[in-house]
Each structure stands twice: as C-alpha cells, then as structure tokens.
C-alpha cells in the first residue's frame, strides 16, 4: 500500500455532461471530506463502501460553491487501485473540473503521474502486469474484435495460461532439486525420458501462445493499407467506397490529391488505417512533388498496398515505375473502371503483367466488386481465417519477446537432457524460462521497465 495520496482528472477535458476527479490513497476520503458538503449531514469517513452521495464542492477559503457533484466512495481493498478511492462526478468542462482538482490538491494531495492509478492496482496485487497493459489496449481499441481481445486479457486469461506453464516448469524443478539433494535415491519423475516428455509439453504450450501473436498484433495495433497508383486511376474514389463516405475530393483532373489522406476502416474486426496517396508521376508542381515523396515513404511502411490501375488504359510505363516501389506479395491489384468496358477482358493478364497474384475487378462508380475486394484484402492480412479473434491471445510485442526467450531456454534445457548433461545445468535453463515467463505478468521485472510501461498511460488512469 502506498503512503501518499494521489489525484487527477480521469475524463477528457472539454465540454461534456460529466467530469470525474479521481482520488486514491490513505488520505483520499479525508481530503474530499474537507471540500464536500453533503445534502444530508453525513460524515464521509463513515459511509459504507460503494455508495454515492449528492452534495456541493465548496472552497474552504471563502465558502463559495464551486459545483454540485456526486461523490462515490470505494474502500480498500475492493477498489480499482486496491486503496481507498473517491471519485467526484462534477459537471463537464475545463474550468469546473480543474477547480475541483485544485481544491483537492490543496489538501496535501499529490497530482498523479500518467498511469499511476493502474500502477497502484498492479503494485497492490489487484491485477498483474498483463492485465494492466490490457487496460490501455481497451482504451485504444478501434474495433469490437480488438476490444474483445483486450477484455480477455484484462479478465486474466493470459495470466492463467502463463501461470499454468510456469507451474509445469516449477514441478520439474522440484523433482530436479530433490534428485540433487538426495542423489542416493532414484526417482522415476526425473528420468531423462520423463523430463524430455514434460519439457516437450511445455514447449508446445509456449509455441501455441506464440502462434497467436500475428493475429493478435493485427487486432491490437491494426494495419496500414496504402492506396497507390498513377494520377486519375480512381484512388480517391476507392477510398470513398471503402469508407462508405465522401472523404476525398474526386475530379477528372490528374493530381487532385496532393497530400496523403488517412482514415480508419473496420475490416471484419481488424482496424485498418487506410491511406489515399498522391498519384506518382514526374511533376514540376512543388506541392505535388512533396505529396509524391510522402507517398514513397508510406509505401515503404505499408502492411498491404492496394495498387489501382485503369482498365480502360491498361498497364503502361508509369504503372511499371510504381510497381517497382511496392511489395507485390503484400499487394492487391484493383482493376478499376470496369463499368467503362464494352466487351470481355481477360483480367488475369493484369496479374501476369504486374506480378501481383491477388486481383479484383472493381468499379468505384457503382461499387461493383467492393465486397469481393474487402474479402480479398482480409485474406491477404489473415491467410488462415480463425474467427473473430477467439484463438488470438498474445498481442503485445513485449509478451512475444519474453515468450521467445522462454522458448529458447526450454529448448536449451531439452538439448542438455538429450546430451546427458548434469541435471543442475538443466535447472539453470528452466529457472531462466521461469523468469522470462514471470516478466510477462510482472512477477520478475525491474522497476525501470515497469515505470516505462505505465508511462504510456494517460494521466487519470
């Protein structure tokens, strides 16, 4: 339990119905009591936990009313932080909320650092580190699927799986320690064959977790899809079609889009940052030149490229130049303006000419082929469809890195057993794997790394 008490505004500043000032620590109730006058004569220090009280916040210096509020009291240890927590629900807006916070801080309360409320929940043992990280993922979730994944992690599902793997390692280590302490006895549990079988089982557990990372990463972080092509092939029209709204200006004049336009698309639960770029061509226009350079930068960073060509023109030298800038394996060829066709066209010849195997005939004018385009894009991102994220559990790069380190230690332990190394050397590798897995839940992690993780949070959380 922390000795000092902290406070911060927990809602975004700006006009709104409600603004919340959160106070946590041993002095939370007393601090609020000093500035809160309840409608009924109540002693805030004696009210039950999980109760809500109507009253007024008053400036003790002059007795003037600042705001009408609702005050909720949540006593330790059953609160968000595991400490006494008081939340003051006042009217939204900048001045009122900041004034309430100012009065609380004058009671000897410290302004909270970014993520400090959640950090206290972790340090007080209410949640583990993976659950704390899930809190920020919930805040940042852009789709229902990414929210669902973060919710599973917050509920402790990842912690349970990690702890189950750690317990298997501990069981092996226990038998190894016994065999080291009592070498005169023979134990069936620590024969090389049994140990190899048990370690293989643990290795498979870790690999299963690791195999879910790529899908989990996409759900958590989203992907960047860049629309590329020469001027006037329908890139902006494609953006508008995907978003189902007029986000970009569309004209028949080449070079209308001079800068990148970004927006977000929910593609079957995947957060997709869709980027409409300036058409790549040789130009003397300075502004358009800068837009073309920015397009090149985005193409280098793209997870997938939607390469748009005009079917009424075909593939020409300008298209070939752009093709040299993109990753064809992570691209979707959009053969646009099929509404202008008079006869049959062999669309596969476009795939052969461009070297992009994934293609879709499309009309940005009447949206023909839009659903097929979205399905193709999804297949490129998720080659093996696994549903809406049920099997994905690892989504954080930090978790992936520690799982890989643990896997390497387990493989080293397996190799040591197979080559007949002494069991105490095997124990070194197993203990290392145990530490790496513990770092995911925060059981074996230094203060500097913990502080860095919580610094990513906003103030008030």
From Swiss-Prot:
Main location: cytoplasm
Keyword tags: Cytoplasm, GTP-binding, Hydrolase, Magnesium, Metal-binding, Nucleotide-binding, Potassium, tRNA processing
Entries under Pfam families matching the protein: MMR_HSR1, MnmE_helical, TrmE_N
One GO term of the biological process aspect: tRNA wobble uridine modification
Binding-site residues for GTP, renumbered to this chain: 232-237, 251-257, 276-279, 363-365
Annotated positions binding (6S)-5-formyl-5,6,7,8-tetrahydrofolate: 22, 87, 126, 461
Annotated K(+) binding sites: 232, 251, 253, 256
PROSITE patterns, per database record: G_TRME
InterPro entries attached to this UniProt entry: G_TrmE (IPR031168), GTP-bd (IPR006073), GTP-bd_TrmE_N (IPR018948), GTPase_MnmE (IPR004520), MnmE_dom2 (IPR027368), MnmE_helical (IPR025867), P-loop_NTPase (IPR027417), Small_GTP-bd (IPR005225)
Residue span(s) of domain TrmE-type G: 222-382
Keyword DNA repair included in the entry's annotation: no
Annotated positions binding Mg(2+): 236, 257
Keyword GTP-binding belongs to the record: yes
One cellular component (GO) term of this entry: cytosol
Location(s), subcellular: Cytoplasm
Record-level Gene Ontology MF annotations: GTP binding; GTPase activity; metal ion binding
Superkingdom: Bacteria
Disulfide bonds: none
EC number from the UniProt entry: 3.6.-.-
Cofactor: K(+)
Family from the record: Belongs to the TRAFAC class TrmE-Era-EngA-EngB-Septin-like GTPase superfamily. TrmE GTPase family.
Assembly notes: Homodimer. Heterotetramer of two MnmE and two MnmG subunits.
Protein name: tRNA modification GTPase MnmE
